[in-house]
Amino acid sequence: MRLVVGLGNPGPEYERQRHNVGFMAVDLLHRRYGFGPWKRRFQGLTAEGSVAGEKVLLLKPATFMNLSGQAAGEAMRFYKITPDQVLVFHDELDLPPGRVRVKRGGGHGGHNGLRSLDDHVGKDYWRIRIGIGHPGSKERVTGWVLSNFAKAEEQWLEPLLDALVAEAPLLVAGEPEKYASRIALLTQPPKPPKPPKPPKDGAKETAGKGTEAETAKPPGPAAGRTG
């Protein structure tokens, strides 16, 4: 069995906050793969189901972020799950918005949810780090993570969550490297169009007659670009 934990804070007022992107990922997993109903257990909400034939327990701790490890530790002890079978979706300040990294073990990087998990679970669990970007100064971090995603951020957030969930079979099958590669491929921003090739000598001569002058003009700004 795999234990898949989403980190976040319980309550509707926190639903769209950056700190709750782990909850968002687990909620989408629950819907897409037809998990059973949410039940209150282990100081949180749990749901049982399977992904690609692998039995999975979803967990959203109801302890608030700083005590997330208490809920995960209880579930692990009950089901005799080892740390390497635990997958944690969480927000990551040190990654640009929309970037994802998957790693096993490591430090908490100041993330209080991970700090609590380290205390109750150990450090040898898998982390799916979902980049939310950094506000620029330490003083602004709390306000940043506890603020809602802006409307403009939905352009990368929704496709990213879709990709995280669509490729989940790779993750639960124990292929995190392939999972991370697929996420990067599916969420790669479109490349800007290449500049037009310079016209050949013959085209230069006819351009002066007004027949191809228009096609020789450089294109305007690419649609959708914000600079």
Swiss-Prot record:
Molecular function via GO: peptidyl-tRNA hydrolase activity; tRNA binding
Domain of life: Bacteria
Keywords assigned by UniProt, alphabetized: Cytoplasm, Hydrolase, RNA-binding, tRNA-binding
Catalytically driven reaction(s): an N-acyl-L-alpha-aminoacyl-tRNA + H2O = an N-acyl-L-amino acid + a tRNA + H(+)
Residues of the active site: H19
One of the record's GO cellular component terms: cytoplasm
A biological-process GO annotation: protein quality control for misfolded or incompletely synthesized proteins
Protein residues bound to tRNA: Y14, F64, N66, N112
E.C. designation(s): 3.1.1.29
Keyword 4Fe-4S: no
Disordered, as annotated region: 182-227
Annotated Basic and acidic residues bias: 198-215
Ribonucleoprotein among keywords: no
Site (Stabilizes the basic form of H active site to accept a proton): D91
Subcellular location: Cytoplasm
Record-annotated site: Discriminates between blocked and unblocked aminoacyl-tRNA: N9
Reported function: Hydrolyzes ribosome-free peptidyl-tRNAs (with 1 or more amino acids incorporated), which drop off the ribosome during protein synthesis, or as a result of ribosome stalling. Catalyzes the release of premature peptidyl moieties from peptidyl-tRNA molecules trapped in stalled 50S ribosomal subunits, and thus maintains levels of free tRNAs and 50S ribosomes.
Subunit structure: Monomer.
Family stated for the protein in its record: Belongs to the PTH family.
The protein's name: Peptidyl-tRNA hydrolase
Gene: pth
